């Protein structure tokens, strides 16, 4: 037998899942971004504990046909990219077709979806990426995804999850970042029956910030905007008096997507160098 072996599809899926799904917050990010790409105007994130046991994302987006639902959890299945030329014009949050396959490989999933204008919907259950049941059902337009027992078949991954408190906070933070990047979509986050935040979805960044980050912070912010070389920048900056000793509430977005950027952080801190201790 040769030393080099081709991985089984199941093992390849588990490895890929480890790259895409690091913790429950990764699932929140991927499912909320999928809802945005589906044209949702409202998204609700519900979790219990830290999100590993139970996590539900509901949207009123375009939904899926039974045919699309049947292949949505296969690796490299995507509705967002069809040829190489499309790579030059990607305008969606995701396009690789890996997230749903990765999530389903390490969890139990219940999907309920109905295409806009369709007379009925589809209910489907999956265990470790394998479809267990699929049938027609009545449901609202849009999609509801329930993810249970994340990492049930990869105990080493589950062992390294933090406390429910920490994982739940990370899930809420992921949903909040998504909401800040899309003030045109109403996002609600609920943990153990308690609403953590709600954004109005009125496409006004100031009211979005007010709802998500609180009145005191919102009232201390100063609007800023500029454009150069085809790049437009807009947002809010805090007054020096409202400065904080950490970067915890520095948020940068590119085309609606939250990003980490050491260069942008450095530029921001350089601008404040004479007024803040950073």
Task: List the model feature ranges, each with a label.
Residues 1-278:
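N-terminal phosphate-binding caps/lids of nucleotide- and nucleic-acid-binding domains
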